[in-house]
Regions:
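Phosphate- and other anionic-substrate recognition elements at nucleic-acid/protein interfaces
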Residues: 1-167
């Protein structure tokens, strides 16, 4: 039972269902993608060194995503855990802020490692994931972090469709 069931949100003339997914890929850059159903609503990337040197820019992005989707639709968030070569305090801090915000709002969080995402899509390495996301979106100008966030959301949604996710 949905705790905060509301009327569907309208965005650019389209009705957004009550279930949405925010997929986040933290690393040297923060890639994010917002899905509803298997349709990609929006995606982007933020550079930690330039845009996140001051946390106000990150908080502004978070407020935008929150107001656009999560506050209204109470969707599911995916956060790639801070593994791999980029193990900085900033990465862990951002993952912590995201998880804390989600838990306080009763939004379930599922962590999925980027390597398992790529394996489930049957792609090899970064270039394979980037090619998959570029082909799926029809956008040849995605960053690697955007591509990983998009692939992560797609894997979750496909598993949800097949009944493998209980949430």
């Amino acid at each position: 039972m949905e705790k905060h069931l509301q009327l569907p949100l309208r965005f650019e003339g389209r009705t957004i269902p009550s279930r949405t997914v925010l997929s986040i890929d933290p690393g040297w850059k923060l890639g994010w993608a917002v899905f509803y159903g298997l349709e990609l609503l929006e995606h982007g990337v933020m550079d930690f060194q330039r845009e996140l040197g001051d946390m106000r820019r990150y908080k502004a992005l978070w407020a935008h995503l929150w107001n656009l989707k999560l506050r209204h639709t109470f969707g599911i968030m995916l956060v790639e855990p801070p593994f791999g070569r980029f193990r900085s305090a900033r990465n862990g801090e951002i993952c912590g802020i995201i998880k804390m915000s989600a838990y306080e709002s009763d939004i379930p969080v599922q962590e999925m490692h980027v390597l398992s995402v790529r394996a489930k899509l049957n792609v090899k390495g970064k270039k394979g994931a980037l090619a998959y996301a570029c082909q799926w979106t029809g956008n040849e100008h995605l960053s690697q972090h955007e591509a990983d966030a998009i692939c992560q959301g797609l894997v979750y949604l496909k598993e949800k469709e097949n009944g493998k996710n209980s949430r």
